[in-house]
Amino acid sequence: MKNFNLNKIIRPNILAMKAYSSARDEFKDASKDLIFLDANENPYNNGLNRYPDPQQRDLKQILSQIKNISTENMVLGNGSDEVLDLIFRAFCEPNQDNVISISPSYGMYSVLANLNAVEYRKSLLNIADFQPNLDDIFSKIDTNTKMIFLCSPNNPTGEIIKRNTLTEIVENFDGLVVIDEAYIDFSDEQSWIYELENYPNIIVTQTLSKAVGLAGIRLGILYASKEIISVLNKIKPPYNVNQLTQNKAIEILKDYEKINAIMQVLIEQKAVLKQALENCSFVEKIYPSDANFILIKVDNANKRYDEFLEKGIVIRNRTNDDLCENCLRITVGTEEENSKLIETLNSL
């Protein structure tokens, strides 16, 4: 980070381009009683006949109040995958640059790298504690390494990356460090969004799909410095978050007490599930989890996966992931769902 220069990270063509200005961008601060005859919309009101706010200002304002972060430090997208893709397109030169990610981790990083013709370099976690291997990560960095992806809490392992480990990476890498915090609401650790002023080279992504319970509307949030946000707004599709998504997100986020109450129930249910797993004969190891799921090592993952499926319970078989041989990932369900799961555990 000592030599971090954003202008050297941005693709030259992106640095030079001008952002597309949509019809609603031009009048985003205008009075709502204007007659809009500029965007070739159907003028008859049905609640959705107008284009949505391209900057999602009302939704960002609520997120700003919840997170205590300026709206100028946000980009919203059609799920986290869209904002992650924006990062690749803004900063990585196809067929030239590379990115590094811990492994095992979220599979879309490699998919997006391949989609954007960017070399993807895996760094295996330490098998003993599922923490990043710093020596290995730093050995993989070269002059064309633009970004390091760190999912924390990590999927599928469930563990949060130790803060001193993340700090060492952020402070000693001159590119961008992307911290994926999809599961941060289930952890006691403080989010890295509150370090944006201290570290201009970090990008933090979050989602409404997990703790908030809005996976069906697809809404991802990216937090970064105002300079990085300005770059991403250049290339973001103007109406990438539709009006129905914005409306539903605002509706649910207004009752954050209810969201917190549900999160607390899930955390309690995770403890119940963990205790049941500890008493299960075919479970060989239960990995620590700061997320809403538990990764377990069993005697035969393929066999146990099929047995659960026969009982009508779908879990995730991670046995083909790096370092996850014979591992299953179980999402914490409702009390009723967990009871059915525990009943099945006891019957196998």
Specify the residue positions occupied by each region the protein language model found.
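Phosphate-binding glycine-rich loop
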Residues: 57-98, 116
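N-terminal "arm"/small-domain region of PLP-dependent enzymes with the aminotransferase-like
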Residues: 1-65
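Active-site phosphate-binding strand-loop segment of PLP-dependent enzymes
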Residues: 128-187
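PLP-dependent aminotransferase-like
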Residues: 6, 93-150
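PLP-dependent enzyme catalytic core of the Aspartate aminotransferase-like
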Residues: 164, 310-311, 320-348
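Short acidic capping loops at alpha-helix termini that bridge into adjacent secondary structure
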Residues: 70-74, 95-98, 144, 181, ...
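Conserved PLP-binding catalytic core of the aspartate aminotransferase-like
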Residues: 267, 279-311
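PLP-dependent aminotransferase class I/II
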Residues: 201-279, 286
